[in-house]
């Protein structure tokens, strides 16, 4: 998973 700049986990 990666952490996007909005703070969401994808």
Curated annotation (Swiss-Prot):
It is found in: Secreted. One of its GO terms (molecular function) is hydroquinone:oxygen oxidoreductase activity. Keywords: Copper, Lignin degradation, Metal-binding, Oxidoreductase, Secreted. Its EC number is 1.10.3.2. Its cofactor is Cu cation. The keyword Metal-binding applies. It catalyses: 4 hydroquinone + O2 = 4 benzosemiquinone + 2 H2O. The keyword Metal-binding applies. One of its GO terms (cellular component) is extracellular region. Optimum pH is 4. Activity decreases at higher pH and is lost at pH 6. GO terms for biological process: lignin catabolic process. Inhibited by NaN(3) and SDS. Partially inhibited by Fe(2+), Fe(3+) and Hg(2+) but not by other metal ions at a concentration of 10 mM. Disulfide bonds: none annotated. Binds 4 Cu cations per monomer. Belongs to the multicopper oxidase family. Lignin degradation and detoxification of lignin-derived products. In vitro, has activity towards 2,2'-azino-bis(3-ethylbenzthiazoline-6-sulfonic acid) (ABTS), catechol and hydroquinone but not towards 2,6-dimethoxy-phenol or guaiacol. Monomer. This is Laccase.
């Amino acid at each position: 998973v990666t952490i996007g700049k909005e703070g969401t986990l994808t």
